[in-house]
Curated annotation (Swiss-Prot):
The gene is yabA. GO terms for biological process: DNA replication. This is Replication initiation control protein YabA. Keywords: Cytoplasm, DNA replication, DNA replication inhibitor, Metal-binding, Zinc. Binds 1 zinc ion per subunit.
Length: 108
Protein backbone atom coordinates (compact mmCIF):
# COMPACT_ATOMS: atom_id res chain seq x y z
CA UNK A 1 0.00 0.00 0.00
CA UNK A 2 2.87 2.34 0.80
CA UNK A 3 4.29 1.77 -2.68
CA UNK A 4 1.07 3.10 -4.25
CA UNK A 5 1.35 6.31 -2.27
CA UNK A 6 4.96 6.66 -3.38
CA UNK A 7 3.86 6.30 -7.01
CA UNK A 8 1.18 8.96 -6.49
CA UNK A 9 3.75 11.26 -4.87
CA UNK A 10 6.14 10.70 -7.75
CA UNK A 11 3.37 11.40 -10.27
CA UNK A 12 2.53 14.62 -8.43
CA UNK A 13 6.18 15.72 -8.54
CA UNK A 14 6.38 14.83 -12.23
CA UNK A 15 3.21 16.82 -12.91
CA UNK A 16 4.63 19.86 -11.11
CA UNK A 17 7.90 19.55 -13.03
CA UNK A 18 6.04 19.28 -16.34
CA UNK A 19 3.91 22.33 -15.51
CA UNK A 20 7.05 24.32 -14.69
CA UNK A 21 8.68 23.18 -17.93
CA UNK A 22 5.56 24.07 -19.91
CA UNK A 23 5.55 27.55 -18.38
CA UNK A 24 9.20 27.99 -19.34
CA UNK A 25 8.53 26.80 -22.89
CA UNK A 26 5.63 29.24 -23.22
CA UNK A 27 7.89 32.08 -22.08
CA UNK A 28 10.58 31.09 -24.55
CA UNK A 29 7.98 30.92 -27.33
CA UNK A 30 6.76 34.44 -26.54
CA UNK A 31 10.32 35.78 -26.60
CA UNK A 32 10.98 34.00 -29.89
CA UNK A 33 7.78 35.38 -31.45
CA UNK A 34 8.72 38.90 -30.38
CA UNK A 35 12.22 38.46 -31.79
CA UNK A 36 10.88 37.13 -35.07
CA UNK A 37 8.46 40.05 -35.36
CA UNK A 38 11.22 42.54 -34.66
CA UNK A 39 13.48 40.76 -37.14
CA UNK A 40 10.82 40.95 -39.87
CA UNK A 41 10.30 44.67 -39.18
CA UNK A 42 14.01 45.36 -39.30
CA UNK A 43 14.38 43.40 -42.54
CA UNK A 44 11.63 45.47 -44.16
CA UNK A 45 13.23 48.71 -42.97
CA UNK A 46 16.62 47.55 -44.23
CA UNK A 47 15.14 46.69 -47.62
CA UNK A 48 13.53 50.13 -47.87
CA UNK A 49 16.80 51.80 -46.91
CA UNK A 50 18.69 49.78 -49.52
CA UNK A 51 16.11 50.76 -52.15
CA UNK A 52 16.51 54.41 -51.19
CA UNK A 53 20.28 54.10 -51.32
CA UNK A 54 20.03 52.57 -54.79
CA UNK A 55 17.83 55.49 -55.89
CA UNK A 56 20.35 57.98 -54.57
CA UNK A 57 23.22 56.19 -56.27
CA UNK A 58 21.38 56.23 -59.61
CA UNK A 59 20.79 59.94 -59.36
CA UNK A 60 24.07 61.75 -59.57
CA UNK A 61 23.30 65.04 -57.98
CA UNK A 62 25.47 67.63 -59.66
CA UNK A 63 23.96 70.55 -57.81
CA UNK A 64 25.94 71.79 -54.87
CA UNK A 65 23.92 72.89 -51.91
CA UNK A 66 24.98 76.13 -50.26
CA UNK A 67 26.87 75.64 -47.01
CA UNK A 68 24.25 77.53 -45.01
CA UNK A 69 21.45 75.12 -46.02
CA UNK A 70 21.23 71.53 -44.74
CA UNK A 71 21.53 68.60 -47.10
CA UNK A 72 18.02 67.93 -48.50
CA UNK A 73 18.62 64.16 -48.65
CA UNK A 74 19.48 64.04 -44.96
CA UNK A 75 16.46 66.20 -44.13
CA UNK A 76 14.21 63.84 -46.05
CA UNK A 77 15.65 60.78 -44.29
CA UNK A 78 15.31 62.52 -40.91
CA UNK A 79 11.71 63.54 -41.69
CA UNK A 80 10.90 59.93 -42.56
CA UNK A 81 11.82 58.99 -39.01
CA UNK A 82 15.45 57.87 -39.18
CA UNK A 83 18.57 59.12 -37.45
CA UNK A 84 21.13 60.87 -39.66
CA UNK A 85 23.76 61.41 -36.96
CA UNK A 86 26.91 59.29 -36.88
CA UNK A 87 26.00 57.76 -33.51
CA UNK A 88 22.69 56.19 -34.53
CA UNK A 89 22.65 56.45 -38.33
CA UNK A 90 19.65 54.72 -39.97
CA UNK A 91 18.08 53.68 -36.67
CA UNK A 92 14.41 54.50 -36.39
CA UNK A 93 13.47 57.49 -34.23
CA UNK A 94 10.91 56.78 -31.53
CA UNK A 95 7.48 58.40 -31.90
CA UNK A 96 7.89 62.13 -31.23
CA UNK A 97 11.63 61.77 -30.56
CA UNK A 98 14.05 64.48 -31.64
CA UNK A 99 17.79 63.78 -31.68
CA UNK A 100 20.05 66.73 -30.87
CA UNK A 101 22.97 65.16 -32.74
CA UNK A 102 20.85 64.84 -35.90
CA UNK A 103 19.58 68.40 -35.60
CA UNK A 104 23.10 69.73 -35.08
CA UNK A 105 24.30 67.87 -38.17
CA UNK A 106 21.44 69.22 -40.27
CA UNK A 107 21.54 72.82 -39.13
CA UNK A 108 25.15 73.67 -38.34
Amino acid sequence: MADKYDVFDQLGELENTLNTTLTQISGIRQVLEASMTENATLRMELEKLRDRLAEFEKKEVKKETPKDQPNPNLIQIFNEGFHVCHLHYAERLAEGESCLDCLELLYR
